[in-house]
Amino acid sequence: MKVTARLTWIEEKILEKLLGNASLTLLYQSSAHKNCVSEMTQKYSLQGSTMTVFHLEKDVVVGVFILENFPRLVSEKPCTCAWFSLKRNNSSGISALFLNTKVIVDSEELIIFSLDGLSLSVTPLRGFTLALNDTVMNGLELNLGHGFLPVECEIFRVDGIKKNPSFIKKMVTAEQHRGKLLSALRAYKPYKDLVSEVRILLVGPVGSGKSSFFNSVKSAFQGHLTRQAIVGSDESSITKQYRVYSIKDGKSGETLPFMLCDSMGLEEGEEAGLCIDDIPHILQGCVPDRYQFNPCEPMKPKHSPHAASPPLKDRIHCVAFVLHINSVNTLSDKMVAKLKKIRKDVVDCGIGYVALLTNVEEYDEVLDDSFANMTETVTSLSQVQNVQKWLNIPIANILMVSNYASERRLEPMKDILVFAALRQMLRAADDALEDLPLEDTGNLAPF
């Protein structure tokens, strides 16, 4: 008879994402197989990477992933282990730890040691008693006591995973780093409160992912996927209007102190796509939200009530040059010339700028294990070198993301890249605000 896993489909997907898009195959279930260690080890020993899951009362799931083969007896060689806990009915409530451990197996008990002592012990013959030490309990944010009875124990084989301890550690700690970035962005305030909200202009060729980046930012803050901005794959720009999007924090509901300004896509033709003569007006804050672009007729300042002297709050404070990473090396000379012209306008206005490369496929390999810097492999890419040369921009301001497209749920590594890119844009904006001449800082009101 086929045994059905107690893990829900959503819980399986969360755990698979935790390990970098792995797949789970059920090997053992305590209610369907014998409650003894020998039966357990017979099912999962020498099966490769495994995940042992304990279903507890109060809708809590606790488990441990072991990268190496699970031994039949005492293992003196440390194993790469990731510990996790899930709270049912809370799809984002996952906590995880990365520990090097040793495994002891005998006829009555399964014990997993970490360097600080006993971490987990399982005794099926005593009614499947499970015990976790304080280190694991605190790290997994559990308050269950030291000895408790699991409702069910399941063991899964884990396939499609990279056999690399560093990669596993990176995947396991990604959620924690995502939380740190999110907290930092929630606490962000523009430099010396010169403006209440920083404005970031997204500019780039048609199909580069400008609107998709806004959708990705909004999704990451909301905690679920959303697609407010219309996106598409037409050869001409889907975005016809100038849009100023505010971002709300999904937790507090408050509007965050930054806006993303979406523009029409650039095209090679002189009377197609965003007219680059419109750029200075946008940068200076002379263009209202929902202004309809006309590629054949450059913008006139009369469209804005602040055209004579727009307040600082209406101006652009950072520009993000958005480029599809797979199209960078095939950009025409005309398109590169347009990007250089826009960069000159940005510099002349004293505005900070970054480059944002989208549609990165191996997005989990962009940042190093500490999530602090891009890897050397990434910074040496020809696309990065070309963008650096064209825009005369430091490597630190060349950012990479993989926008959400067809996914149905958020991924920590994608969110990390989105948050890291946004953080660098805000830093560039703050640098520009700090460098403003006194006469400009005096033109602040109205907020």
From Swiss-Prot:
InterPro entries: P-loop_NTPase (IPR027417), TLDc_dom (IPR006571)
Induction or repression: By respiratory syncytial virus/RSV. HA-28 antigen is expressed after induction by inflammatory cytokines.
Places the protein is found: Cytoplasm
Tissue specificity annotation: Expressed on cells of the hematopoietic lineage. Detected in transformed cell lines of the macrophage and B-cell lineage. Expressed in spleen and bone marrow.
GO-annotated biological processes: cellular response to virus; immune response
Gene3D superfamilies: P-loop containing nucleotide triphosphate hydrolases
Domain TLDc: 1-159
Protein family: Belongs to the IFI44 family.
Record's subunit section: HA-28 antigen forms a complex with Kb MHC in BALB.B donor cells. Interacts with FKBP5; this interaction modulates IKBKB and IKBKE kinase activities.
UniProt protein name: Interferon-induced protein 44-like
